[in-house]
Amino acid sequence: MLRVLLVDDEPFILRGMKELIDWKNEGFEIVGSAADGEEALLFLQNHDADLILSDIKMPIMDGLELLRKLRISEKYRDIYFIILSGYADFQYAQEAIKYACNDYILKPVEKEKLVQALRKVRGLKNIELEKERETLGCKELETKV
C-alpha cells in the first residue's frame, strides 16, 4: 500500500479527494492532509509518505515551492509528486516538470484522470522495487561466489 499525503488549502477539496475514488482498491492509503507546503513538510518530519498530491496556489508555501524543497532534500527527494491545479497555464506545468513532478492534473479533478495518474505512480514504484530486488539478488550472488 502506497502512503499518500494530500495538500490543499481548501477543506472541501481535501474531503472531495478522499471520497473521489476507492484509494485502497487502487493500492493507496491516505495517511494525512495539510493546508499548505509548510504544514506538509512538518507532517513529513514524523510520518512517511510515498506520494504527495498538492495544489499549486496556497498561502505560506505553495505546491511548487514544496516540490522544490522535496527535490533538494536527501530524505524526501524520491517522494512521488502530483500537482492538482486550477491553472492551465503552461508556465506552471513547465515549472512542475522542471522539478520532476510525476503528473499535473487540472481541477476539477476527474476520477479517471486521477486513477490513471495513481496507476502510473504505482507502476513506477513497482519498477523501482523490482530494480531493488535485482540489485539485492546480484549482491547475494556475489557473496556466494
Model-derived regions: residue spans:
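Receiver (REC) domain active-site loop signature in two-component systems and cognate sites
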Residues: 58
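Interdomain helical linkers/hinges and coiled-coil/dimerization scaffolds
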Residues: 97, 103, 109-145
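Alpha4 helix (beta4-alpha4-beta5 surface) of REC/receiver domains from two-component response regulators
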Residues: 41, 65, 77-78, 88-103
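Two-component/phosphorelay signaling modules centered on CheY-like receiver
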Residues: 11-32, 46
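Active-site residues of response regulator receiver
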Residues: 8, 55
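Conserved phosphotransfer cores of two-component systems
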Residues: 45-47, 71-77, 99
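Helix N-cap/capping motif at the beta->alpha junctions
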Residues: 33-42, 63-65
